[in-house]
Amino acid sequence: MRHTRFHPIKLAWITAVVAGLMVGVATPADAEPGQWDPTLPALVSAGAPGDPLAVANASLQATAQATQTTLDLGRQFLGGLGINLGGPAASAPSAATTGASRIPRANARQAVEYVIRRAGSQMGVPYSWGGGSLQGPSKGVDSGANTVGFDCSGLVRYAFAGVGVLIPRFSGDQYNAGRHVPPAEAKRGDLIFYGPGGGQHVTLYLGNGQMLEASGSAGKVTVSPVRKAGMTPFVTRIIEY
């Protein structure tokens, strides 16, 4: 999907308010690298049955549920803007898409700001490896099994779900979920990635050389200076504005 233009963004759909996250567009600044945050290992979920067919069915069911949850959140967001996407009878999007409806281009900037507010509402929430659902913090796996919180990819997935945009769970997949943009052209709301193929960490760009992240080294959701060391060649733009 590299360099594919998502214009306008398909939906499938938010809450939360936080002030004080800086507005502006700036080139990511140099800073010392922090500890990379790992994403979930490619292992079968602890709750999934061992039979391959049962595992596949459980995965499909989880995907359908995530799609419907995101669609409902997106309807709430656009409804708040006075945009009616249809009643309960409107068909749900297929698992192969992020939604049956689209964010109007005129509302894209509002959507980006809502994504940032939704992520910012989780400031101070603990870091939990594998943690985070579309609806909020959750227990993770392994080292995060007893901690309710977010890991890096779980936080950004939660943030975008609020406006009806369903992105993949793993940061390496999130890297290819939108249009790739040179870091010098980064805009507020773009995703910044670290490690080969974006597989080691993801953050949400705020502008002015700052980013919002679920940080393993800080142990919580926090705002940090953008680190250039280990950054991927491109940032990813999920919502065009």
Curated annotation (Swiss-Prot):
The keyword Metal-binding does not apply. Pfam families: NLPC_P60. Residues 1-31 form the signal peptide. Keywords: Cell wall biogenesis/degradation, Hydrolase, Protease, Signal, Thiol protease. InterPro entries: NLP_P60_dom, Papain-like_cys_pep_sf, PG_Endopeptidase_C40, RipB. It comes from the Bacteria. Disulfide bonds: none annotated. Its EC number is 3.4.-.-. GO terms for cellular component: peptidoglycan-based cell wall. The active site is at 152 (nucleophile), 201 (proton acceptor), 213. Residues 109-241 form the NlpC/P60 domain. Optimum pH is 6. One of its GO terms (biological process) is proteolysis. GO terms for molecular function: cysteine-type peptidase activity; N-acetylmuramoyl-L-alanine amidase activity. Peptidoglycan endopeptidase that cleaves the bond between D-glutamate and meso-diaminopimelate. Binds high-molecular weight peptidoglycan, but does not degrade it. Required for normal separation of daughter cells after cell division and cell wall integrity. Required for host cell invasion. Belongs to the peptidase C40 family. PANTHER family: NLP_P60 DOMAIN-CONTAINING PROTEIN-RELATED, PEPTIDOGLYCAN DL-ENDOPEPTIDASE CWLO. Monomer. This is Peptidoglycan endopeptidase RipB.
